[in-house]
Amino acid sequence: MGSSSGQPEFDYLFKVLLIGDSGVGKSSLLLSFTSNTFDDLSPTIGVDFKVKYLTIGEKKLKLAIWDTAGQERFRTLTSSYYRGAQGIIMVYDVTRRDTFTNLSDIWAKEIDLYSTNQDCIKMLVGNKVDKESERAVSKKEGIDFAREYGCLFLECSAKTRVNVEQCFEELVLKILETPSLTAEGSSGGKKNIFKQNPAQTTSTSSSYCCSS
C-alpha cells in the first residue's frame, strides 16, 4: 500500500554504508541487491546512492544504501557519509589479499574515526566467491577478523547472487534487534539522512521487493 506521494510506506528508515578498497565489487553488490542484476562496473567516483524497500517479518523497511569510493583521493569526501549510519558493510575481494589486509589497516580505523553511532552494526563481506580457484583469503581468516572486530560475516558473489540478499538482511535483522538504532530509524523520528550534498552522488535509483 503506497502513501499519498506514491512512495511505499515504511516503519523504519535505515542508513547503510558500503566501504572497502576500489574494485572489490561494492557497486556490483549494491546493484545485485537492489535490481537483481550484475555488471562489471567502473570504480565509483565519490559516492553513489540507492534505495531499497523490503519487508522483514511484519516490518516494512526503507534502506538508504551509500556506496563509497575506495580510492584514497576520495577519502575526505566520503568520510562525512559515516555520520548517522546504522549499518556499515566492509567488503573485500577474496581473490585479492591486499583488500583484506586493508580492512584493519584502513577501513576499521575509518569506522572508529568517522562513525558517529557507537551501536552501529558492522558486517564483513568477502565478495567474488565465484572465483574459488583464485582465492587468496580463506573463509577462516574472514571469520577470525569478524570475531576480532565484532562484525557479522558472510561470503558472497555479486555475480551469481549467492548470499547477496542474506548480507543485507542479516545486517538489518541485527539493527532491528538494537533498540537505540530502531529508535533512530523509526518513521516517526527519522533523520535527514538524504541531505548530504546531492551534487556528490553519481546516481539515484530505487527498487521494491518483499522477503520474509
From Swiss-Prot:
Name the UniProt record assigns to this protein: Ras-related protein RABC1
Family: Belongs to the small GTPase superfamily. Rab family.
PTM annotation (N-acetylglycine): residues: 2
Gene it is expressed from: RABC1
Membrane association type: Lipid-anchor
Major location category of this protein: membrane
Lipid-bearing positions (S-geranylgeranyl cysteine): 209-210
Function of the protein: Intracellular vesicle trafficking and protein transport.
One matching Pfam family: Ras
Region feature Disordered, mapped onto this chain: 182-212
Motif Effector region: positions: 41-49
